[in-house]
């Protein structure tokens, strides 16, 4: 029975293909009319969009980087290379997207931000020029004369000895220029005789990758350190859909290691290295057998040939669509509809070197020893990338179907004492195999999340493939229960991928089998920029703006404004920032799939849409939140946003001080950047060293014109302390006990408070001249001046908390404003006076009548402690206002100022009394006023002489 049934099925299958073929011919005839309608509609839409796209500059390279302003101060930036220059955007804060640099010039093929270099010794190098941007462009004659040139054999040549022609500058970029974002100028140039394919930077080295060689220069001095020969870099024959970037490149630089595509397998001292046999796992699941999958793949390919006649009318797209499902069962490196040979070109490879295709070598940047070497793929390597920790290495081949993730675990060999070597075979573990797709594509960008749990792979087709590195391979992390947040990976002091089998004492055991992971979500590219056709029709009907689609470069970063952050989903798994082919930066939010039960059918949404989930991999939803159009227009001006000098200079000063401090003398830096890029808060403190104290003081100068309560920090019992950053190993988890953090007090150094003098025009005069004052007479016909001597003067006393009010003024005359400068509560005892006030018992000053030289009778002003705003003189003369303090009237009755109050003098109100104490009064005034005089010209006719002391006091703090 089974044989008979099997025979029937074998005969039914070809007949079914014939029926399907005839049906497809009928459908294709009708599809031709539909396709023509779609093409005409697309052409009209493209024509409407092209008008707005014509003024945009052509982008040649795009990527995200990190701008380091200090040891713990970083900002995410977007780097854009154009046919006519480059552009740098600050994308750290969504509310303040800022264009830092926009330069026009020649074509740029690569951009990279250089981290702050690690300083060693007294070498300053180019530290003063940081932050530095590395620009790969053609060799130009207008560059700076400072730089080096590298010959083909790796020797260092003189600057200007490059044989590259002027015409090769556009097609073959051979120059690396170091652009300072601080001075906005090129400070250094590296010239090579072959094209520069890629650049990677760390705090130790700057690695420049050429077609067959890698040069590593010191990150601080930019001097050549070493070079290595590599497998020829595959050159793309044609660009991808986005026509931006040419591939990520087979080179990776971590905090300690350099990974590159090795040209040949190295030999150890114990013998020839035996490479580990690489067997690619099937694409379906780890439990599937490779033999069965290959048989099914061949059978499916033979069956697809029977459909060729029916599919030929549907065009090349239909064939690729059907072949896509057949290729899903093929192992890595098998023939695919789009062969990698049609995308990549690898030149300069001999027969022996071709066997080493896919070999990866890891080199120690400090010792220069080879840490590990293994065969990652059967095809040439096209992309290498380290995670933020520098221990996970992502590898991709020219096929681009599968991406492997390895963990680098150095294992020392003990063959020779004192010899630094590693066991290459046991220094790596294959952790994950990420399946991107079945068609070949160029991997042009790779990015990790901060905790290395998420990884995004961007292909040249404009699609961003998002994976989650889950060691179990299940989807438990994305299926939230109702009313609960999604389960996330637990935090641990050890790496999340660390297991007991990976410990150093068990490395003799076989490594675990690599876990096959599939895409959890995709950000797809549409040729018209829309996310999908249905949503576009909806947005067009509602009048909403379409969302830019696709991806060229990405970074896991949350750049959301405060308003949108309040409305953000609480169950968001991660945020990713993407640069699209249309020139937009889009902020996406990663959300878990919706799993709600329907009361009618009792089924979950995910189960009812199983076909859609299988097609689109919607285990994690990617929703755009906001986007910005950042592509430069042809009419935009160049921009040079200068970084705050306080940031770079203070950072340099702190680094200089910390390098010269002993272990006991430590410096603590706290640099806080707010959303506005030009503002910063800077606090510097030094620890105490018994019995000395570092000369670092906290000073304050405050101008106060009204009275009020003292601030809390002005109290003498208040002190300031600075806590050092915790460096204990127990604080690695993010929490620490604040009581155990060492704190150091900031010294507030004070000096005696001194009065501030307002000199204006000072002249020397006699004592009588200092007490002479000009009076102004106002009449209906005009103003005339009368000289005379004022026979009464009043001394003003000022208390720190009290206010200065004008007790008397004139309706016709103008009043003078006085300022009261205050400091800490220690200034009260700075100045005291023994000058008599001559008050009466009822609190009113004595009125002394005296005939002046002109026969006028002057009646001096009476100053009461009241709220009078003006005082009139009966004889028609006015005097400047007298400023008094709101102290109690007992001060006037006793004739002595209260203790603890400072004062200042206005000598135009000082009273010269002809009594036996006149000589004592002259002596005291000379000591206080220092013989300063005030000259005021009025209508250039006469002069007003007298001393003036401005109300106020200032504290001189620090040394």
UniProtKB/Swiss-Prot annotation:
WD repeats lie at residues 376-416, 438-479. Coiled coil: none annotated. It is found in: Preautophagosomal structure membrane; Vacuole membrane. It comes from the Eukaryota. Induction: By sucrose and nitrogen starvation. Expressed in leaves. It is a peripheral membrane protein. The PI(3,5)P2 regulatory complex regulates both the synthesis and turnover of phosphatidylinositol 3,5-bisphosphate (PtdIns(3,5)P2). Required for autophagy. This is Autophagy-related protein 18g.
């Amino acid at each position: 029975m089974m044989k008979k049934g099997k025979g029937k099925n074998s005969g039914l299958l070809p007949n079914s293909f014939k029926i399907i073929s005839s049906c497809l011919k009928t459908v294709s005839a009708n599809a031709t009319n539909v396709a023509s309608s779609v093409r005409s509609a697309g052409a009209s839409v493209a024509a409407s969009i092209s008008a707005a796209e014509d003024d945009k500059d052509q982008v040649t390279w795009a990527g995200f980087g990190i701008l380091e302003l200090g040891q713990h101060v970083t900002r995410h930036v977007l780097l854009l290379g154009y046919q006519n220059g480059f552009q740098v955007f600050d994308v750290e804060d969504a509310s303040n997207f800022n264009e830092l640099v926009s330069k026009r010039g020649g074509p740029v093929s690569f951009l990279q931000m250089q981290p702050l270099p690690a300083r060693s010794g007294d070498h300053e190098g180019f530290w003063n020029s940081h932050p530095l941007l590395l620009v790969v462009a053609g060799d130009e004659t207008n560059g700076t004369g400072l730089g080096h040139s590298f010959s083909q054999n790796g020797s260092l040549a003189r600057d200007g000895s490059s044989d590259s022609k002027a015409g090769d500058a556009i097609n073959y970029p051979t120059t690396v220029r170091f652009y300072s974002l601080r001075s906005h100028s090129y400070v250094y140039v590296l010239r090579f005789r072959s094209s520069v394919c890629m650049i990677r930077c760390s705090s130790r080295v700057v690695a420049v990758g050429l077609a067959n060689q890698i040069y590593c220069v010191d990150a601080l001095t930019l001097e050549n350190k070493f070079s290595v020969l590599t497998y020829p870099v595959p050159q793309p024959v044609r660009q991808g859909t986005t026509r931006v970037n040419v591939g990520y490149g087979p080179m990776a630089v971590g905090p300690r290691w350099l990974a590159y595509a090795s040209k040949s397998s190295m030999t150890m001292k114990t013998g020839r290295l035996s490479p580990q046999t690489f067997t690619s796992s099937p694409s379906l699941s780890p439990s599937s057998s490779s033999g069965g999958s290959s048989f099914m793949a061949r059978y499916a390919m033979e069956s697809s040939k029977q459909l060729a006649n029916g599919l030929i009318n549907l065009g090349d797209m239909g064939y690729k669509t059907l072949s896509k499902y057949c290729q899903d069962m093929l192992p890595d490196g098998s023939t695919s509809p789009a062969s990698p040979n049609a995308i990549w070109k690898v030149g300069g490879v001999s027969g022996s070197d071709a066997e080493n295709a896919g070999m990866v070598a890891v080199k120690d940047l400090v010792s220069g020893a080879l840490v590990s070497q293994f065969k990652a793929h059967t095809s040439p390597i096209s992309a290498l990338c380290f995670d933020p920790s520098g221990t996970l290495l992502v590898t991709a081949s020219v096929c681009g179907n599968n991406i492997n993730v390895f963990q680098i675990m150095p294992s020392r060999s003990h063959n020779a004492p004192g010899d630094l070597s590693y066991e290459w075979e046991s220094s790596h573990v294959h952790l994950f195999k990420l399946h991107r797709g079945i068609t070949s594509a160029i991997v042009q960008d790779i990015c990790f999340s901060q905790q290395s749990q998420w990884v995004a792979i961007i292909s040249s087709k404009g699609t961003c493939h998002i994976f989650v590195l889950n060691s179990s391979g299940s989807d438990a992390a994305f299926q939230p229960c109702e009313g609960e947040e999604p389960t996330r990976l637990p935090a641990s002091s050890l790496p999340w991928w660390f297991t007991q089998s990976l410990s150093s004492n068990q490395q003799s055991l076989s490594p675990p089998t690599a876990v096959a992971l599939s895409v959890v979500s995709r950000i797809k590219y549409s040729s018209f920029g829309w996310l999908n056709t249905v949503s576009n029709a909806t947005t067009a009907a509602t009048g909403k703006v379409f969302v830019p689609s696709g991806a060229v470069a990405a970074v896991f970063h949350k750049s959301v404004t405060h308003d949108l952050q309040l409305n953000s989903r609480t169950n968001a798994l991660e945020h990713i920032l993407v640069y699209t082919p249309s020139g937009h930066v889009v902020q996406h939010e990663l959300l878990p799939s919706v799993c709600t039960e329907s009361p009618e059918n009792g089924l979950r949404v995910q189960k009812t849409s199983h076909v859609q989930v299988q097609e689109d991999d919607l285990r994690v939803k990617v929703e755009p939140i906001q986007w910005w159009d950042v592509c430069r227009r042809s009419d935009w001006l160049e921009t040079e946003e200068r970084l705050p000098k306080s940031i770079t200079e203070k950072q340099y000063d702190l680094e200089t001080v910390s390098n010269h401090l002993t272990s006991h003398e430590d410096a603590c830096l706290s640099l806080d950047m707010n959303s506005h890029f030009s503002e910063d808060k800077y606090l510097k403190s030094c620890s105490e060293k018994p019995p000395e104290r570092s000369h670092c003081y906290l000073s304050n100068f405050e101008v106060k014109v009204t009275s009020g309560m003292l601030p809390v920090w002005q109290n003498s019992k208040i002190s300031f302390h600075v806590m050092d950053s915790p460096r204990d190993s127990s604080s690695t988890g993010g929490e620490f006990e604040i009581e155990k953090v060492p704190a150091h007090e900031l010294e507030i150094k004070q000096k005696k408070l001194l009065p501030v003098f307002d000199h204006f025009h000072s002249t020397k005069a006699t004592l009588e001249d200092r007490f002479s004052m000009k009076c102004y007479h106002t009449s209906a016909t005009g103003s005339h001046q009368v000289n005379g001597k004022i026979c009464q003067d009043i001394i003003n006393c000022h208390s720190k908390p009290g206010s200065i009010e004008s007790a008397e003024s004139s309706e016709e005359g103008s009043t003078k404003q006085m300022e009261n400068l205050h400091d800490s509560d220690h200034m009260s005892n700075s100045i005291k006076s023994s000058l008599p006030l001559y008050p009466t018992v009822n609190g009113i000053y004595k009125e002394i009548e005296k005939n002046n030289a002109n026969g006028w009778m002057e009646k001096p002003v009476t100053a009461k402690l009241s709220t009078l705003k003006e005082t009139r003189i009966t004889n028609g003369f006015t005097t400047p206002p007298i400023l008094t303090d709101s102290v109690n009237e007992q001060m006037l009755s006793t004739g002595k100022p209260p203790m603890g109050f400072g004062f200042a003098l206005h000598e135009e109100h000082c009273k010269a009394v002809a009594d036996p104490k006149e000589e004592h009064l002259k002596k005291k005034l000379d000591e206080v006023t220092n013989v300063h005089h005030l000259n005021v010209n009025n209508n250039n006719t006469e002069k007003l002489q007298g001393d003036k002391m401005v109300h106020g006091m200032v504290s001189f703090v620090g040394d």
